[in-house]
Amino acid sequence: MATTSGPAGIAMGSVGSLLERQDFSPEELRAALAGSRGSRQPDGLLRKGLGQREFFSYLHLPKKDGKTTKRAPRNEPDYATLYYREHPRAGDFSKTSLPERGRFDKCRIRPSVFKPPVGSGKGFLSMQSLAAHKGQKLWRSNGSLHTLACHPPLSPGPRASQARAQLLHALSLDEGGPEPSLSDSSSGGSFGRSPGTGPSPFSSSLGHINHLGGSLDRAPRSPKESGPLAVLSCLPEPPPPYEFSCPTTEEVAVLPEAREELKRDLGDQDVSNSFTQVLEERQRLWLSELKRLYVERLHEVAQKAERSERNLQLQLFMAQQEQRRLRKELRAQQGLAPEPRTSGSSMEADPNARPEEEARWEVCQKTAEISLLKQQLREAQAELAQKLAEIFSLKTQLRGSRAQAQAQDAELARLREAVHSLQEQAPREEAPGSCETDDCKSRGLLGEAGGSEAREGAEQLRAELLQERLRGQEQALRFEQERQTWQEEKERVLRYQREIQGSYMDMYRRNQALEHELRLLREPPTSWSPRLESSKI
C-alpha cells in the first residue's frame, strides 16, 4: 500500500484504499463464517442477512500486510495525500481511528464496543451514550462509504463481494434510522425493522466508522479532486440495511396475546398430554395440602379459643368466690363492731365504715339479682300460660267424652226398653197354650225358639251395657285424677308466683334502703346527725 508520511509520522492511504484493505479471498470468507450459525433459524425459517457473530468475524478477519500486497498502479489522484498536505494537523485515517468533534485526533476503537450486549441492557446504554457523545453529525457520514461501495476495487470472488455489500449495508445505518423495510438488492434477503424503534446500540457504535467517510467528504478539496467526487456523490443512496433492534413496547404489549394464544393451543390439544397432566396433578396436590393446612390451623385456633374461654370462666368464678368471701368477712366485721355513742366516736369510726365503692357494687349486684328474678317471673308466667292452655284442651276433651257417654246412655235406655217389650210379649204368647192344636204347638215351639234368641240378644246387650258403664266410670275416674293433678300444679304455680313477687318486693325494699344509705355516704357528715345503721341483707 502506498502511504505518505506527514509531520506526525502517521501512515495514510487513499480513500479507495480504505475498502481495498478489506479484500480477502473466498477461502478466508468461508473460514471466517464456518463457526457461525447456519442460514436457518431454530424454528426452520430463513435468517435475514448476516448475524452478529458473522458480522464480527468479518470485522476481525486477518488483513494482509499493506507492504507486501501488490496492487495494480492507478492513475487517479491520491486524495488522502492532497488532503494531508492542505491540513497538516489532521489525524490518522487508518481502520482503527475515529473522528471526534470535527478533528481527526487519534482515537482507537476498543473491543468492548463490538461485543454483543449481555444482561439487562447495560451494554446497550453504554453504546448509546457513546453514540450520543461522539456521533451528533453521523447522519451525514453514509454518503462517502456508499460512493466507495459503488466503485469497489477488484475482489477475489463473487461471494466476497456479496459479503462486503452486506457489511456496507450494515455500516450505512443512520443515527436516526430510516423508515422500515426496504429490500437489499445485493444480498437478496429482505431487511427491515419494526416501526417506531429508535437507533440500536450496535448501529450507534458503527456510526463512528461511517463518520470517517463523511469527514473526508466535508473536507475542502482542490478543483482537480472535486470532479470525480462530485460524480460519486451524485449516485443515489443505497437502501437502508437491516438493523439489530431490541424489543420495543409494542412487542412487549403483544407478548400477553401470544401467551394467551399459546394457552389456547395447549388447551385445544389432547387431554392426555403428560405435561398438562403433571401440572394438573401438582395443582390438585397443592390445593389438597393447602386445604389440610387450613383445616389444621382452624382447628388449632378453635382449640386455643376454647381454652382461653375456659380459663376466663375459671378466673371469673374464682373472682366471684373471693368476692363472696370478702363480703362475708366484711359483714362479720360490721356485725362485731361496737356501736358508737358520741358524735366524736362516730367521726372516728367513719374511716372504718363501708366505702362508697363497695356500696355501689352491692347496689349493682342487687340490680342484677332483681333482673334475674324478673326473668324467672317471666318464665313462670309463660309456663303458667302453657299449663292453662293444656287445661283448656283437657276440658274440651272432657266435654266430648261426656257427650259420648250421654249418647251411650241413650242407646242403653233404648235397648232396655226393647228388652222389656220382648219380655212382655213372651208371656202373652204362652197364655193360650191349653187349647192349642198341633199347629199351635208347632207355632209355640217356633215362638219359644224366637224367645230364646231374643233372650240371648238381651243378655248380650246387658253385657255390652255393663262394659260401657265400666268404661265410663274409668274415664270419669281418670278425668278426676287429671283434674286433681292440674289443680295441684296450678296451686303450685300460683304459690311460686306469689313467692317470687314477695321476694321481688323484699329486694325492692332492700334496694331502696341501700340507695338511701349510699346517698347518706355521699353527703358530708355533720356533728349532730346520728349514724344510721346499715340494713342487714
UniProtKB/Swiss-Prot annotation:
The keyword Phosphoprotein applies. GO terms for cellular component: axon; cytoplasmic vesicle; dendrite. One of its GO terms (biological process) is nervous system development. InterPro entries: N4BP3. Residues 178-207 have a biased composition (Low complexity). Signal peptide: none annotated. Residues 351-361 have a biased composition (Basic and acidic residues). It is found in: Cytoplasmic vesicle; Cell projection, Axon; Cell projection, Dendrite. Residues 295-501 form a coiled coil. Residues 173-234, 328-361, 423-458 are annotated as: Disordered. Keywords: Cell projection, Coiled coil, Cytoplasmic vesicle, Developmental protein, Neurogenesis, Phosphoprotein. Plays a positive role in the antiviral innate immune signaling pathway. Mechanistically, interacts with MAVS and functions as a positive regulator to promote 'Lys-63'-linked polyubiquitination of MAVS and thus strengthens the interaction between MAVS and TRAF2. Also plays a role in axon and dendrite arborization during cranial nerve development. May also be important for neural crest migration and early development of other anterior structures including eye, brain and cranial cartilage. Binds NEDD4. Interacts with 14-3-3 proteins. Interacts with MAVS. Belongs to the N4BP3 family. This is NEDD4-binding protein 3. It comes from Mus musculus.
